[in-house]
Amino acid sequence: MVKFVASDLDGTLLLNGAQSVDESTIQYINKLVDKGVIFAPASGRQITSLKRLFGAVSDKLAYIAENGALVEYKGETIGKTAMDRKLALEIIEDVIEQPNCEVLVSGEHTSYIKPKSQEYYYRMTKVVNYHTTLVDKFTDIDEDILKIAVCDMTGIKNSKEHFINKWSDKASVLVSGELYLDLMDTNVNKGRGIEQVQQYFGLKPEQCMAFGDNYNDIAMLDKVYYSYVMEKAVEDVKKHGRFVTGW
């Protein structure tokens, strides 16, 4: 019997650039939870943004946020993995130096930005609807850094090789969308988040289900038996799913 369901958001639960979860999905999730199934959005997004998305059921869910750097269930932190601060600041400086790239730095409940363009500021605060804090210097951040997100407004395909080649031996580097690439501690991925939920509730992979579509979902798909990949996903990701779905 399935007791835990995790789903990626962008490209999976949210299709075609949608930035809100439709009411029918919320109602279905509520029915699952009422039957004793644990549901967790598993996303590169911040936890504050995730809770806004799920509205009326937000306090009933588990959360695998920041690609697994922060895991929470009903307000209790199950897992939290921060980046080495010195390394994080070096990566931030590198992102800033890239002409088409913006940086977003994740704390536990807010994300820090110093926008180069009004377009990026609007996207993060109005489109994605993140809780953001403007900073003059990223060295002023006085909490743990959980994740660094690179946003290339021309498409992350144009800059991903730079970050993969430069940082993949020191950090976990994952493409998380058409515009985004995430860097975390080497131990962080959605699969680790799934493991922490499984350990907390004493669940086996055969009791777990996950849905995903992108490279940052692979580790999560590998940790459950019922692994569903979206039909539009690239073949490298589809290899990690037992099932293919188009909703």
Model-derived regions: residue spans:
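Asp-based, Mg2+/Mn2+-dependent phosphohydrolase catalytic module
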Residues: 223, 227-247
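Short active-site oxyanion
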Residues: 36-40, 59-61, 146-147, 206-207, ...
